[in-house]
């Protein structure tokens, strides 16, 4: 018996907006609605190809993303916003302009930032019941 696993890869534009769950009013499949006065952390990866792999679990099929992404160096006051894995929603766009939302309020992405000398590292881990692509 073979276990076939297909990995989907999609190129995302070089702007990602990261919201902590506590900043959000609502999240739909195509829109992130922040609470009044809340703004996301915006990061700029050089190039971003997200890899999504299906994972069959006892509870059903999940789509997993586990990546560390180099991003432009953040100001120190922004880099410390995610020092440990933090439940978050990530919003970006693919190259056709369609919004890509990673994480849901029920299954948020776990996000943290690792400071480095030249570039910071954005660590993302998420399992979703529906593919964001």
Question: Where in this protein do the model-derived segments appear?
Answer:
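Solvent-exposed edge beta-strands and adjacent loop segments
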Residues: 2-68, 107-115
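Oligomerization/assembly interface segments of phage tail-like spikes and tubes
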Residues: 54-77, 117-130
């Amino acid at each position: 018996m073979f276990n076939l696993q297909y990995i989907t890869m999609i190129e995302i534009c070089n702007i990602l907006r990261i919201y902590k769950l506590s900043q959000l009013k609502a999240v739909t499949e195509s829109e992130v609605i922040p609470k009044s006065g809340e703004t996301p952390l915006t990061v700029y990866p050089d190039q971003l190809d997200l890899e999504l792999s299906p994972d069959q679990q006892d509870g059903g099929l999940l789509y997993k993303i586990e990546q560390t992404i180099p991003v432009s160096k953040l100001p120190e006051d922004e880099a410390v916003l995610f020092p440990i894995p933090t439940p978050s929603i990530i919003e970006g766009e693919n190259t056709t302009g369609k919004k890509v939302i990673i994480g849901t309020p029920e299954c948020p992405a776990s996000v943290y930032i690792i400071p480095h000398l030249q570039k910071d590292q954005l660590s993302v881990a998420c399992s979703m019941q529906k593919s964001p692509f």
